[in-house]
Structure formats: C-alpha cells, structure tokens
C-alpha cells in the first residue's frame, strides 16, 4: 500500500501537461485513455518493484503485529533471521504473490480516483492548493483500498502461515476457504473500517507532505535539488537522492499517524486464524484487546520500528522506479 501511495503522490506533485488536440478519429479522448494506461503501467511497475524489495520486512511485520506464537518473543532483526531458519529463504516472501496481484489494480485505481477527486474538489467546492491534494489523496486511497481489499486479506492470511501449519495451499484455495467458512463475500472485508480510517490520514498526509516538499524544493533550489526530465526538458524532476529523502519523511509521518489502525486491521483480517478470534470481532473490541493485553508500545505500535526501517528503501525504489517509468512512458 505504501509504495502505490508513494508513486501516486509523485504523480500528484507533477500533474501531466495538457494533451494537445489530435485531428481525426481517435483524438483527445483516445490520447487521454493512453495517458491513463501509461500511468497504470508506471504505477504498477513501481509498486511491484518497491513491494518486492521490502517483502521480507512485510512478512515479519505481519508475524509481529499478530503475535504469531513461533515468533512473538522475537524482535525485528531476530525474526528476519529466524524465518529463513524455520521456513527457508522463500519464507520471507510468503504472501508476496498475492501482493503483486493486488498492487497493479491498486495503483491504477488510485491514480484515476485522485485525478477525478482533485478535479471535483477544485471545480465543485472551489478548494485548491495543498488542501485539495490532501483531500483528494485521502479519498483516492480509500477508494483503492475498498476495491482491492479482498486481495490484501488473502495476502495477510498467506503471510501469517508458518511452514508445516498451512490452512491454505495458495491464493485460490484461500479465497474459496474464506468464502465458504467466514460468511461469504463479507468475509473478505473483515477489518475494512480500521483500514479506511487508517488510509485516510496515511494517503492524505503522504500526498500533502511529499507534494509540499517537492514543490518547495523545486521552487527555492531547482538547480540543487532538481534536473530536467529526459522525456521533457521543460519539466523539472527531483534528483534521486532528494526523492528518497522527501518520500522517507512523508512515509514516516504518515505511518506514525495511521499505524494503530494498521495493527487493528491485521488482527481483524486474520480472523479465525488467531486463538483470540472472538475477542477481536469489531474495531473497538480489537483495539481494546490489543491495548489491554499489550499496551501502546508493544501492542498498538508493535512493529513500528520495522515500518520506519521499511520506509526509506521502499520509498526510494518506488519513487526512483516511477520517475524512470514516467519518462519511459512520456508522462511528463
């Protein structure tokens, strides 16, 4: 999710130039469709590269957040060593296949929804500047989450499994089992509310922070922080190391604000996999249980240090890849 939001934030800070009118059939509408297709591909590729880079950290985060009994007494780095010892090296990438399937539509929906909401907020409500980026980013993030939530649910279930204790043999089997045993279609949306409540500040703050840092940086120090885009010399883009810094700051702030909702969401998604399932049926009950049994630092914010460690490499790969893809697909 973070990677797609990072790439979307980059697109938000650099809106595409107006498309020229094309003569004959397949004019401006076709060209605009091609723009969204290119955005879809650019965002999907960037998201997949970033998520694959930090997949081992994502796996450990799920295990620590939900207090898996094999690893609940371990920290981040000791868990990174313990997982390969127990499950092999590929154990660090368990659930990543489902994430790759999810990240492409997630990125596409987020890009299109952001542009739509940004235009709607500007034209209908008369709100512009950084505020409309904050609002549109929050709404786009929530829209993308709702549309792709079942895939994230399955990914979490697969990531939580430990070798020798598999409830699901793969993505399709997980879908079938959840549908059959956990209330049909609604079983795929357990934990949606805390996810939405967490996504609103996460996506909004990510868009707002990165967009603000980028616009201020390129306005006040264009030579030091920026360079001409390879596909359009008239457009300035951030240098790679500056992208890393801005993305890291945006991600760290957004994660800190939304992390308790992320912990709550993971526990609700895991559902019957956890022994305390009946105590975590609602968002309120889940937060109360986690806080009561584990406190704030070891409960609601357990694994946050891992998210901070994930933030810099994830944002670096996402922004760098997306910058390259924007130039490759002529999006500047």
UniProtKB/Swiss-Prot annotation:
SUPFAM superfamilies assigned: Mitochondrial carrier (SSF103506)
UniProt GO molecular function: antiporter activity; coenzyme A transmembrane transporter activity
InterPro entries: GDC-like (IPR002167), Mit_carrier (IPR002067), Mitochondrial_sb/sol_carrier (IPR018108), Mt_carrier_dom_sf (IPR023395)
Solcar repeat extents: 34-120, 128-216, 238-328
A cellular component annotation (GO) from this entry: mitochondrion
PROSITE patterns: SOLCAR (PS50920)
Alphabetical list of PANTHER family matching this protein: SOLUTE CARRIER FAMILY 25
Protein family: Belongs to the mitochondrial carrier (TC 2.A.29) family.
Descriptive protein name: Solute carrier family 25 member 16
């Amino acid at each position: 999710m973070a990677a797609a939001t990072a790439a979307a934030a980059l697109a938000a800070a650099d809106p595409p130039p107006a498309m020229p009118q094309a003569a004959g059939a397949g004019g401006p509408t076709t060209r605009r469709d091609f723009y969204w297709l290119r955005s879809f591909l650019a965002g999907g590729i960037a998201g997949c590269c970033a998520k694959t880079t930090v997949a081992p950290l994502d796996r450990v985060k799920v295990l620590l957040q939900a207090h898996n009994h094999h690893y609940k007494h371990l920290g981040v780095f000791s868990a990174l060593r313990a997982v390969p010892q127990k499950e092999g090296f590929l154990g660090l990438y368990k659930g990543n296949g489902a994430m790759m399937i999810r990240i492409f539509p997630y990125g596409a929906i987020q890009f299109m929804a952001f542009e739509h909401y940004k235009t709607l907020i500007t034209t209908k409500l008369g709100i512009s500047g950084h505020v409309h980026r904050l609002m549109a980013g929050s709404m786009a993030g929530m829209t993308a989450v709702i549309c792709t939530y079942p895939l994230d649910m399955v990914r979490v279930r697969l990531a939580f499994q430990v070798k020798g204790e598999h409830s699901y043999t793969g993505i399709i089997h997980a879908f079938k089992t959840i549908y059959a045993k956990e209330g049909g279609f609604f079983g795929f949306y357990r934990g949606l509310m805390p996810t939405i409540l967490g996504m609103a500040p996460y996506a909004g703050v990510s868009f707002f922070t990165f967009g603000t840092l980028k616009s201020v940086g390129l306005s006040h120090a264009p030579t030091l922080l920026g360079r001409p885009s390879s596909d359009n010399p008239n457009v300035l883009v951030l240098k790679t190391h500056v992208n890393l810094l801005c993305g890291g700051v945006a991600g760290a702030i957004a994660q800190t604000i939304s992390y308790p909702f992320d912990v709550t969401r993971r526990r609700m998604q895991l559902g019957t996999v956890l022994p305390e399932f009946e105590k975590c049926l609602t968002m309120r009950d889940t937060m109360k249980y986690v806080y009561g049994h584990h406190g704030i630092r070891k409960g609601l914010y357990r694994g946050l240090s891992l998210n901070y460690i994930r933030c810099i490499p994830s944002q670096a790969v996402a922004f760098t890849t997306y910058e390259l893809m924007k130039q490759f697909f002529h999006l500047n």
